[in-house]
Amino acid sequence: MDRGLVALATAHGVSTWYEDWRHRRVEVAPETVVGVLGLLGVDATSPAAIADALAAARAVDRTALPPTVVLTEGRTRALPGPGVVSLEDGGRRAVDGELPGDLPLGWHHLTCDGREVILVVVPRRLPAPPRTWGWMLQLYSLTSARSWGMGDLGDLAEFTGWAGTTGAGLVLLNPLHAVGPAHPVAASPYSPASRRFVNPLYLRVGDTGAYAAADPATRAVVDALRPDRGDLIDYDEVWTAKRHALELLHPYAPPVDLDADPALRNFATWCALAERHGNDWRAWPAELHHPDAPAVAEQAGQLADRVAFHAWLQHLCDEQLDAVTAAARSTGMPVGVVHDLAVGIDPGGADGWQLADVLAQGVRVGAPPDDFNQLGQDWGLAAWRPDRLAETGYAAYRDMLRRTLRHAGGLRVDHVAGLWRLWWVPPGAGAAEGTYVRYDADAMLGILALEAHRAGAVVVGEDLGTVQPAVTRGLRGRNMLGSTVLWFARDDDGAFTPPARWPRNALATISTHDLPTAPGFLTGEHVRVRDELKLLGTDVAVERARAAADRERLLAMLRAESLLPRSRDAATEAGGPPDAAGKAAGRPDAATKAGGEPDDGDVVVAMHAALAASPSRLLGVSLYDVLGEVRQPNMPGTVDEYPNWRLPLPASVAQIRTDPGVTRIVDLLTAARPRRATAAPAGTTATAAPGDMLADADPAGQRATPDAGRA
């Protein structure tokens, strides 16, 4: 590659090579580098253009203040001269050649050397998360006597209140991000129209003030619209019913002040326009491509009732999420509800329209080739432009975090490595023909820490896959948790790692939404369905043999750790009683299959006993695992071939509360992780005890695994 192009790419944070999952150096094609530089507004299409752009990059005064300064509390920073800090609270501080280490946390302004820049003072670290356990929940999968064909925020409040009374410390949700209002309704929560607003599909119609205020005849019409639960969740049917019901109730609601929240007004305007023109703003008439365009104002006036309606839906979402937070707080949950932040957005959605100035237009975020995805992955998501974020004081990033965290006791950040770098695929290129673009990780992580600190929230980064060591170190240094998954906790020879060696600085789980459930793994369902969908890269017999070997490796680890009870016959032959696994699992005698194989139910309990035996700060339990569901929520590599994000749980909220298998797991984990008397209620900030910081060395972590696919 031309040296000038390499230097230009380096100056703008664009990688010209990367290390693949086999730790081999891979050179990026020059045309990819040129294409990605173009997405950053840098012309590199000719030698002359490269020379001009490189000269401009080298002419930048490196001693000048950047547009945004992110300073960690307790640290100082040299300045080019005297200045004044205008504090967030209205105060002012004169500074002379250096930013002092005692500035308060927050968003300030610095005037120095003839410039005014944003100054963000961020915490060194968050308080250490409590040692507790909780449920991982795909909210759409819940059902109850009052929900309409899918789980809703009323179900979540009920479930959270019950979980808190049984000793759970958290409930981790799928993303509740907004999707487009036009049909077909998007099922994937990881490709949202907006990460700043909530999907009104999750509203409980009967819990709204407008329903209570409506006359009996209107309520009867609304009640008759309720769809029944089906074998699969039909988002279009649910949205059609709920939208009609809420339209009937809207006249009974007080008006929403759109001037109080310009971002909400713009989002509601996008929703109204999307109903008229479709969910992808890029296909709208050109005069509607910018929120401030005169044609947008004209059509918003024509659609004033629809704009008001969609703004009202967001107010309802806020009210019902507040009720969920109250349910967690009332039971003393030390963490509470943990929301999930998707790695990106649908570029044609509301955020792509409203935040276009800070997004790289035309880029598609994905992942490079790996052992599981040899052609790479194209998630079709938009990406922040790192230069524009800095130029605008990270305002869009901050506001996104604030809107999510105001209802959260914790935040899971999907693909947290994206705060360091993202795989950009330029227009016209295949998923493997992208490259990494670097972000200011200190700024991204620091601002996340500041907003989480203010919300009293814990942070969990999804750092599975081939992530750089800097990611794990960065999370640990700020008391943010990583992720560990039993399936990936392996030694180099493929043996499962004993739970005592799992990382302390982590949320530990058996599986994820992209992987087989515990019952599905034990029965080989993951092989059967992938064979049926033509997703296997090898012969099905080979895959079955691998799955059987993996099962035996798992059983060997559970037996070695005395977590799996032996059968009575096996114990008698060994000259002793059934072993100690019964204690951990709460069942002294093991059921067995023909041939002495342990019962799958006992194995699932033992797998949860492994979670309980780990040093990991947080433990996450999936209802799919505990209720015996063999189908996984999402099958990477499929769209319509598999019912992704549409599988209801096999039990209702009421049935979950009395299910013997659920009770067994609750008893096991509550005994292993009893509530600490000093735990802070959900939504408040606890103070870490001395020596309780997470920056110390963790036990051995898990083997690097490829990035999980995203549908």
Where are these regions (language model features)?
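Alpha-amylase-like alpha-glycosidases and glucanotransferases acting on alpha-linked glucans and related
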Residues: A182-D318, G344-A571, G596-L618, Y624, ...
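Carbohydrate-interacting/catalytic domains
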Residues: M1-L173, T208-P216, H453, V458, ...
